[in-house]
């Protein structure tokens, strides 16, 4: 088992480039199943484990998928299988995004119930409600969700009880080949939704209103392959913004799109962090003293839940009491216990956490409880006394490309090692401490 070892105390300086957005590329690759002719070419694709998983799902379904030099080429013109088995879906809940395109294109989809990060229940009832409104029959049993429709799906007016990103994406894809017009009300507004709509429109789709609460999809009879470049990853950008701030560093985050990061920029500036637009990115200058703040996670354009754990790491360094309220997912404070192992003064009260700072964090062995928590623990390690050892890196690899190498390029004392190497390093450090 591998772990990342961080030795705290270095200010980060330099330039880091953001990858293509993980949360945009997965639905875009899934949407390639809609193309009954021509190949799709998707550029700026990050080399993440989740990308390899969704590629395997498409191959299992009968599509030809080639991934090289950050470019995915998909040919889904042949006859497709309609079942996504548990061996793939258990690794990543985004695999459920093949339901919409399969149902629209073939009239049938059978997908195993999803896996991925263990963040609350994350139900997919909004997806299924939308499919039913468009004329599909749904059966759930034996660990699978099966959807069927006679002929084409029918355009419908669908109100989402919650602006679910996954449901919005799945229903856009299903509606793209439906007969008539579908209207999604209370739709998710994330930049990744806009990216998906732009891709489907390039394939010959007719989608209007993406990025607003009301999206209209006029169904077409067929879609073709298209070339598309994925937007930069706003969560990776935000993570490096926090890395610069927490270490009192000075870092240019290339590819960070200010319009995608409005709430994060506002909250970091409220803490006293200097953020400047520079070229095609943002320069982050961390202050010597951070101010405490309160924040609440919300659907976009509110504060993103995927930045909650990183901000918790930053707030442990703030001078005073801060509060974070999580409204998007339940059970997303598991990293708080790991921060406590590092001397964090954190108290959980229902869906909120109270953070008292500043504290001098202490290096410890901690486990990444989910993807973003893994990054947050590494950020905390950047300013902890001694060395911090972060395990369960499979979560981190689902969302970050060469995270430790990028931090090392900014001056962090960080390395990724296996168990044997870790023991050797720790023994050397014990001897060094004894001789000091």
From Swiss-Prot:
Query: What is the top EC class of this enzyme, as a single word?
Result: transferase
Tell me which residues bind UDP-N-acetyl-alpha-D-glucosamine: 93, 122-126, 306, 328
- List each coiled-coil range: none
Give GO terms for biological process: cell division; cell wall organization; peptidoglycan biosynthetic process; regulation of cell shape; UDP-N-acetylgalactosamine biosynthetic process
Q: Which GO terms describe its cellular component?
A: cytoplasm
Q: What is its EC number?
A: 2.5.1.7
Q: What is this protein called?
A: UDP-N-acetylglucosamine 1-carboxyvinyltransferase 1
Organism name: Bacillus licheniformis (strain ATCC 14580 / DSM 13 / JCM 2505 / CCUG 7422 / NBRC 12200 / NCIMB 9375 / NCTC 10341 / NRRL NRS-1264 / Gibson 46)
Q: List the gene name.
A: murA1
